[in-house]
Amino acid sequence: MVNALTEFSKKLDEKLVSPLRQVLKGRKLVSVTSPQGFGITNVDWGKITEMSGGMVSYSFTSGNTDQIDATLVNSKIPVYWKDYEIDRRIFEGWRQRGIDIDAANAIAAAYAAAKVEDAAIINGVTNDGTNYDILGLYQGAGNDYNTATTLGTFGNATTALAGAINLMDDAGIPVDSLKLNWCVNSSAYHKIRRTRSAQGQLELPDLLDLLNGGELISVGTTLTTAQAFVLPDSSVGEPYVDYYLTADFQTDPKTPEYQTTGNIGGRVFSAGVLRIKQDDAICRMSNLS
């Protein structure tokens, strides 16, 4: 029975991978490590808080010695999970006759767990709904463009995006050589995409030009319509931020070995934590409408 449940769980895992790749938004925004092992419960990393200025002299002996100011950060690694049940007869049919697995319940549970993981990466981890134990990309941004901006009026989005990138530039981030992404609420995303001038010119091409080949990305309703952020694309952003993955999404059967009736219980889970190494590489926008 235990071996059958284990094999059943593996088959479910195979069915979960492809659908989850389509719905996981947070992992598409940052570089993701290979799974490091579920037994890892916390991780240390260096967070750059200040970089010393360069020196100009006629020899290396005439300048002062400075150090990069970095703070060692330790974070617990949260687990994202959701329980599910599969009809007992479906399991028995698979075990005895090799019929196809109905993975609908497990996939639904995986979507629920993925939504929680997305919220952790995009916004942060909070237990009380107010205070963030672990900062996500929005909450952990080192810059804040808070000028009131009404989207949908031609030119406003361009002005706001340029202002946010300007703040990152002033903080020492080489924005002119980085591919950037602008991540917005789903409502703002569609409003921006349809914005045109009185002459019918779309605003989107101007925005994409500012992003150096990056994208306008919808993160759904994880952020409110007033919230957005700009950050380096995952292809170039690993020095600034990454997602430390300890366990990729997988299933774990919970039905006891001796149980022969009742539905098959299981759990879908993953584990990982966002590591913001240089928060100035992210600029949030907090006053959009």
Predicted feature locations:
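Helix N-cap / beta->alpha transition motif
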Residues: 87-91, 184-188, 278
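Short, charged/polar micro-motifs that form catalytic or ligand-binding hotspots
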Residues: 70, 95-103, 172-175, 179
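Alpha-helical scaffold segments that mediate packing/assembly in large oligomeric complexes
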Residues: 81, 85-164
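A general secondary-structure signal for short beta-strands and their flanking turns/coil
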Residues: 77-79, 177, 261
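Sequence/fold signature of self-assembling virion shell proteins
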Residues: 1-54, 191-289
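Long, hydrophobic/aromatic-enriched structural stretches that serve as scaffold segments
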Residues: 32-99
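Residue-level signal for secondary-structure boundary elements
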Residues: 114-117, 121, 169, 173-176, ...
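Extended, solvent-exposed, turn-rich assembly/linker loops in the middle of proteins
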Residues: 132-205
